[in-house]
Amino acid sequence: MAMTTEVKDELSRLVVKSVSARRAEVTSLLRFAGGLHIVAGRVVVEAEVDLGSIARRLRKDIFDLYGYSAVVHVLSASGIRKNTRYVLRVANDGEALARQTGLLDMRGRPVRGLPAQVVGGSIGDAEAAWRGAFLAHGSLTEPGRSSALEVSCPGPEAALALVGAARRLGVGAKAREVRGADRVVVRDGEAIGALLTRMGAQDTRLVWEERRMRREVRATANRLANFDDANLRRSARAAVAAAARVERALEILGDTVPDHLASAGKLRVEHRQASLEELGRLADPPMTKDAVAGRIRRLLSMADRKAKVEGIPDTESAVTPDLLEDA
């Protein structure tokens, strides 16, 4: 998940001047990274993230925008927890923060998706919503056949809100339920690059695009190599089949075969892997490849006509599956 860390590190250092966008990012990050809890009758806002820089950014924005202090607890890696986690908690002013960020509605009920002011906000707010969601629970895989940018969502309503925000940014995203968990996925390479830029991870996008291009170049080279191999195999089989038919033609015609056709046929039999152009150079006197092809074609046609009249196997009978398999 190296690319994921690179994106989150860059986004956590991004300077955003728009107050509206900063509010949208805080709201989205809180919605996707944690939730609301009732502790001793009070609403507590929590968010769990995987980088200290994200926790510090969120704590600073909450204080700058809303004036509330947050406490960050560090959960060290141990047991089933593979990596260090950071839990930000606003306890004393949790309900006030939840109402101001739109996590609670006017009646004090939790908002299941994203608040209306974020969903219906500006393009900058839509970018900030994606930035907050990615900082909370996003991942970016290495470029390849199964490359994807994903965000794990707290519920289907939040997933649909994120899909809508992506649509406003001109990015195609899909909401999916995987093993009981809601996710929003972007798979198209161009769309992933565009979304990284929209969120503010331009430097990481350049790295990701470079790796993507290198992989595509390697894939193209492999396809061309496979194509060349297939062409060589087809050419080899065609040459073996042609030589077998010519041998049968010479058997059918015997002494009745014209000398100029016989010489072209013998060249084909003696040099089975040679191209028509090479056979032309080997002829005495030399011929063009079209002249060689024409003589071999007439030789086969003459032999097939005689075989039909006499009721014997024609030149095609010499081309057996075993013969082609060995080619």
Curated annotation (Swiss-Prot):
Q: Which UniProt keywords apply?
A: Cell cycle, Cell division, DNA-binding
One MF term from GO for this chain?
Answer: DNA binding
Gene3D superfamilies xrefs:
Homing endonucleases
* Highest taxon of source: Bacteria
One Gene Ontology biological process? regulation of sporulation
Name the DNA-binding stretches: 275-308
Is-annotated flag, keyword DNA-binding?
A: yes
Q: Which family does it belong to?
A: Belongs to the WhiA family.
Q: What does this protein do?
A: Involved in cell division and chromosome segregation.
Q: What is this protein called?
A: Probable cell division protein WhiA
Q: Which organism is it from?
A: Mycobacterium marinum (strain ATCC BAA-535 / M)
